Regions:
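Sec-dependent N-terminal signal peptides of Gram-positive bacterial secreted proteins and lipoproteins
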Residues: 1-25
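Beta-propeller-forming repeat regions
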Residues: 19-382
């Protein structure tokens, strides 16, 4: 629907809001001060005046990628539109809807365009990609309604929003039992086409399927792979990028997916690498390989800046000796990268070992010839560190 209402908040053209997360991103970021800009309040106030009394702005769960208010060139004309995520609540009937509203700039003012709402309580994921390469960025939402999360895709043309796709996970047997979902979009297999990684979890059986697809108006599934004993998706982390250097005569790095998965056994995590080969999803390791198991989540990182993702493993995290792994205030972390090989030849290659002290904000590089031969501990006299 079109609403002929104009706003003259000039600041909207210059400002936009993204999510804020003060959680440590990596062992390399020992301390991080969140950014704050009080001029963003001008933007919030301007948008608030446009929303109906029973509506408010809402922040999707993937706060590192989007905010409540986003500047996006949806139609590739060089001019950014505003996409604002909103929630509408009917308290008398206990009904909640979530969705988004668009605003376009006509050269002088922002014009309130269209809005679209879905029944649901939260937006678990939101982003903007030209999935079908037609020059228009689609708006992708994961909406949670009661106990079910599903994906919806929209296109905005001439300020009108059209829903072009509701996901039907028909490739999954007993699809109705897979009620939780997570998504990541990016270049996964090196074919220069945007891929959609979809994770579906059966909360009753703790089975999860990871599926890779392309979208051209319809969802084209490339392949799926199964995981067992998955605790939940809310604590699962996805990283896309180069997962191994070139192998054999190939000069290109291997692109893939790194999944940090919370598992039921001992409330541990496993770090698994997925990659595409001959149209199929492959796992780099066995899910039961103890070398990829850790007691809590530690983000992967490109520790040596070679554009290959390294996997962190903490001293004492495997085997019977876990006493050095009990404290989150400090840790001795060994960094490894995958060798890019398959089957029995697949293994991790040691890169470096670093001691991190998060309480006192310092790190200590351990020489490679002393790898796993020394233990770094903090000494205290009373309440003071020596």
């Amino acid at each position: 629907m079109k609403v002929l209402k104009l706003i003259t908040v000039v600041a909207l053209m210059m400002l936009f809001v993204t999510g804020c997360n003060i959680k440590t991103e990596s062992p390399e970021q020992l301390a991080k001060i969140p950014d704050y800009d009080d001029t963003k309040k001008v933007l919030y106030d301007g948008i608030d005046q446009l929303l109906k009394p029973d509506s408010s702005m809402i922040l999707p769960s993937n706060t590192k990628e989007v905010g409540k208010i986003n500047k996006v060139d949806l139609n590739s004309d060089g001019i950014d539109e505003l996409v604002v995520f909103e929630q509408k609540e009917d308290l008398s009937n206990n009904v909640s809807q979530v969705g988004f509203v668009t605003l376009s700039y006509n050269g002088e003012k922002y014009v309130l365009g269209d809005h679209f709402l879905e029944n649901g309580e939260s937006i678990e994921y939101a982003n903007f990609y030209d999935l079908d390469s037609d020059g228009y960025k689609e708006v992708i939402l994961l909406v949670k309604s009661k106990d079910k999360t599903n994906m919806h895709i929209y296109k905005v043309v001439d300020n009108e929003i059209t829903k072009i796709y509701d996901l039907d996970a028909s490739w999954l047997q007993n699809k109705e039992d897979f009620n939780d979902m997570k998504v990541k979009i990016g270049y996964i297999d090196g074919d220069d086409k945007l891929d959609i990684l979809m994770l579906h979890l059966n909360n009753k059986t703790n089975e999860m399927f990871a599926s890779v697809a392309n979208f051209d108006g319809k969802m084209k599934i490339k392949d799926s792979v199964k995981f067992e004993n998955v605790k939940n998706l809310s604590e699962l982390y996805i990283t896309l990028g180069n997962v191994a250097s070139s192998v054999g005569n190939s000069s290109a790095a291997i692109k893939g997916i790194v999944l940090d998965i919370p598992i039921l056994k001992d409330n541990n995590y496993i770090t698994q690498i997925l990659y595409m080969k001959d149209g199929k999803i492959n796992k780099a390791f066995s899910d039961y390989d103890k070398t990829i198991t850790k007691s809590y989540y530690i983000p992967v990182d490109d520790i040596d800046k070679d554009k290959i993702i390294e996997i962190p493993i903490v001293a004492g995290s495997t085997g019977n000796n876990k006493n050095t792994y009990s404290s989150k205030s400090s840790a001795t972390i060994s960094w490894y990268r995958w060798n890019g090989k398959e089957g029995a030849d697949s293994s991790l290659i040691f890169t470096s070992q670093i001691y991190y002290n998060y309480k006192y904000n310092f790190k200590l590089f351990i020489p490679n010839n002393l790898f796993d031969k020394i233990l770094v501990e903090q000494e205290f006299v009373g309440e003071k560190a020596v």
